[in-house]
């Protein structure tokens, strides 16, 4: 179990390098940058969609009848959540910095393995890209006469054009599949090599009991520190939510009382 936890941490911290095994057009992000980006996108999405749902509910017949005024408290709730995010920022930043530092050597070894395998497969990727471009050029050349013929009105029906295009498209499809199959065959040994290297690194880590225990102790220490430092932020969140919850409670009870009066008067 210890090895699994540490493995996940190391793989996450080396995620940018593994991703750039196939992509080279974007600069690598730090682990904390990736966490912040994902969290920001998720929170903003939930916030916007949540506000839309609340708005739809309040404009519905039931919402108008209950008159809970949820949107009146939405900005207050959003402000409280944003404040929590700001308070936790430095704390979680410190946690990831410590974890990244503790696993630096192992990550360097794994990144080295990735780069070595990447260098071996790059010629196959370049060759595949070249062949693919050649196929596209050939496809364009074969389509040119058909396009000209179509523009000149030689085809009276669209079905005629489809019939002439079908063999060309099937030929391109079959040739593309052949290239992909060839590339898959060429890359298979290197994929196995990469998995074997990773397995070797992890096995060495498991056999190194003292080192693994040290990593485990440091990780537990960092998590405990994170929990202690986050307590004030969550207490602030709780205090910030109290007025919102109290307002909701009052509105809801008022709506129930009004509904009960209507029932008794019928």
Swiss-Prot record:
It comes from the Eukaryota. Keywords: Cholesterol metabolism, HDL, Lipid metabolism, Lipid transport, Lipoprotein, Oxidation, Palmitate, Phosphoprotein, Repeat, Secreted, Signal, Steroid metabolism, Sterol metabolism, Transport. Glycosylated. Palmitoylated. Residues 1-18 form the signal peptide. One of its GO terms (biological process) is endothelial cell proliferation. It is found in: Secreted. The keyword Nucleotidyltransferase does not apply. Its main location: secreted. GO terms for cellular component: chylomicron; endocytic vesicle; extracellular vesicle; low-density lipoprotein particle; spherical high-density lipoprotein particle; very-low-density lipoprotein particle. The keyword Protein biosynthesis does not apply. GO terms for molecular function: amyloid-beta binding; apolipoprotein A-I receptor binding; chemorepellent activity; cholesterol binding; cholesterol transfer activity; enzyme binding; heat shock protein binding; high-density lipoprotein particle binding. Sequence repeats lie at residues 68-89, 90-111, 112-122, 123-144, 145-166, 167-188, 189-209, 210-231, 232-242, 243-266. Residues 68-266 are annotated as: 10 X approximate tandem repeats. PANTHER family: APOLIPOPROTEIN, APOLIPOPROTEIN A-I. Homodimer. Interacts with APOA1BP and CLU. Component of a sperm activating protein complex (SPAP), consisting of APOA1, an immunoglobulin heavy chain, an immunoglobulin light chain and albumin. Interacts with NDRG1. Interacts with SCGB3A2. Interacts with NAXE and YJEFN3. Participates in the reverse transport of cholesterol from tissues to the liver for excretion by promoting cholesterol efflux from tissues and by acting as a cofactor for the lecithin cholesterol acyltransferase (LCAT). As part of the SPAP complex, activates spermatozoa motility. Belongs to the apolipoprotein A1/A4/E family. This is Apolipoprotein A-I. It comes from Saimiri boliviensis boliviensis (Bolivian squirrel monkey). The gene is APOA1.
């Amino acid at each position: 179990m210890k090895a699994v936890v540490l493995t996940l941490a190391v793989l996450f911290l080396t995620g940018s390098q593994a991703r750039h095994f196939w992509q080279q057009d974007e600069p690598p992000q730090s682990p904390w940058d990736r966490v912040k980006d994902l969290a920001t996108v998720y929170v903003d999405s939930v916030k916007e969609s949540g506000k839309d749902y609340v708005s739809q509910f309040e404009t519905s017949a039931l919402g108008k009848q209950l008159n809970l005024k949820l949107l009146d408290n939405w900005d207050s709730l959003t402000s409280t959540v944003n404040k929590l995010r700001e308070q936790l920022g430095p704390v979680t930043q410190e946690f990831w910095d410590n974890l990244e530092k503790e696993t630096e050597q192992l990550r360097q070894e794994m990144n080295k393995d990735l780069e070595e395998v990447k260098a071996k497969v790059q010629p196959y990727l370049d060759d595949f890209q070249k062949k693919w471009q050649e196929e596209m050029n050939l496809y364009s050349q074969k389509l040119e006469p058909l396009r000209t013929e179509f523009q000149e009105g030689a085809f009276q029906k669209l079905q005629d054009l489809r019939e002439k295009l079908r063999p060309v498209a099937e030929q391109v499809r079959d040739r593309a599949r052949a290239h992909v199959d060839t590339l898959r065959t060429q890359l298979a040994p290197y994929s196995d090599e990469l998995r074997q290297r990773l397995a070797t690194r992890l096995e060495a880590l498991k056999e190194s009991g003292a080192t693994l225990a040290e990593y485990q102790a440091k990780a537990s220490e960092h998590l405990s520190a994170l929990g202690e430092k986050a307590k004030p932020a969550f207490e602030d969140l709780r205090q910030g939510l109290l007025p919102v919850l109290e307002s909701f409670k009052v509105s809801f009870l008022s709506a129930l009382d009004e509904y009960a009066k209507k029932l008794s008067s019928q």
